[in-house]
Amino acid sequence: MNRRMRIFVNVLLLSLASIAVAQQKPSNTLDASVTFSELRANAPVGGCGCFWMAGGTGQFSYPVWRNFSAVVEVAGHHTSNIPNFKAGLSLVSGMGGVRMRWPTHTRFQPFAQVLFGGVHGFDSYFPAPIGKLPTSYDTSYAMAVGGGLDIAVSRHVWVRALKADYNYSSLRNLQGDNQNQLRIGAGILFRGGGK
């Protein structure tokens, strides 16, 4: 996805969220969640060698219209050893986007979300274009598309039983500078007032 298209998509999402806020009082609630997550990342050249990174995410969502919320997420993941590469990798990302919840009128509430933002990789090896030196860090565009299932324990405390996302980023690597990753996790969710 080129830069102009990314900017267009982000501006479009922000515009739609602003219009939605002005039209109707939301029926969903504020919430904050903390999850433990594992990120399945693709490895350097030389076979799949895919690897898992341990970490976590923190999210805050604010209702904007009916079952839609604006979401902000901060995530961090780390591995001390990339297979066949003799280096570790740490990732920190910050993203924002839109979440939709399906009202089920039961203790179980599924959701889907789309997030856009950036990721910073460090404590690793990032190759450089010809004529430049490689670095131990890089920053790029990031995107996450996924969903999950929340289960009510009480009115304000929920268990995030499952959260699964496809993550895309374009940190420099030896495979065309694209990362296609799977992130799965579970955690706890605190919800505000409301219905």
Question: Each predicted region: which residue ranges?
Answer:
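Cleavable N-terminal export/targeting peptides
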Residues: M1-S27, G193-K195
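Predominantly the C-terminal beta-signal and adjacent terminal strand-loop region
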Residues: I151-K195
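Short sequence motifs at beta-strands and strand-loop junctions characteristic
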Residues: P26, C50-M53, G88-V92, T135-A142, ...
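Gram-negative (and chloroplast) outer-membrane scaffold detector with strong preference
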Residues: Q23, Q59-I130, S140, R160, ...
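Extracellular loop and loop/strand-boundary signature of outer-membrane beta-barrel proteins
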Residues: N42-G46, N81-K86, P129-T135, L171-G176
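Membrane-spanning beta-strand positions in outer-membrane beta-barrel proteins
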Residues: D31, S69, R107-Q109, G148, ...
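Short glycine/proline- and aromatic-enriched beta-strand/turn motifs that initiate or cap beta-hairpins
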Residues: A22-Y62, A70, Y166, R183-K195
